Amino acid sequence: MTQVSVVTPASAEVIQLGPTRMRILEDGRTTGHRLGIGEITLPPRTPGPPQHRHARHDEGFYVVSGAARFTVGETTYDAAPGTLVMIPPGAPHTFANLGDEPTVLLNTFTPDLYVQYFRDLGQLIACGEPLTPENTIEAMSRYATTPATDYA
């Protein structure tokens, strides 16, 4: 029988990355690694990562609640609940919560490659290492992702 995945609010894997929380909803095991899904919660006034590019996966963001600002190269998009932002491979991007309310984003990865990146960052923190630009870039590099230094 085909396996079905049901992830409840209490059963999701949770990775705390400083003030940002990532809940892993699908890590690729059920989808043959074609799709990964996470839920990102950004507290008010929380920046995201520096602009970066993924070489081997698409990334999607669906705004569930709150508001987010997406920066893609030099262009910004203010996204209200119900907005979907799809980032193709190679596009420089970042996101942030500039508002006074928490922002919840449904985050997709096709294929699921980037789920392990968040686990790697969580492991660094669990081992007592602070996240630095150097160790974050090193972790990114394992998943075909590079900083978009031309938009730093």
Model regions: which residues?
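Hydrophobic ligand-binding cavity/cleft-lining segments
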Residues: 1-15
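Structural motif
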Residues: 21, 60, 67-69, 76, ...
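Short, conserved beta-strand element in jelly-roll/cupin
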Residues: 39-43, 53-72, 108
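Ligand-binding loop in jelly-roll beta-barrel domains
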Residues: 69, 89-115
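Acidic/histidine-enriched, glycine/proline-rich intrinsically disordered or flexible terminal extensions
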Residues: 119-152
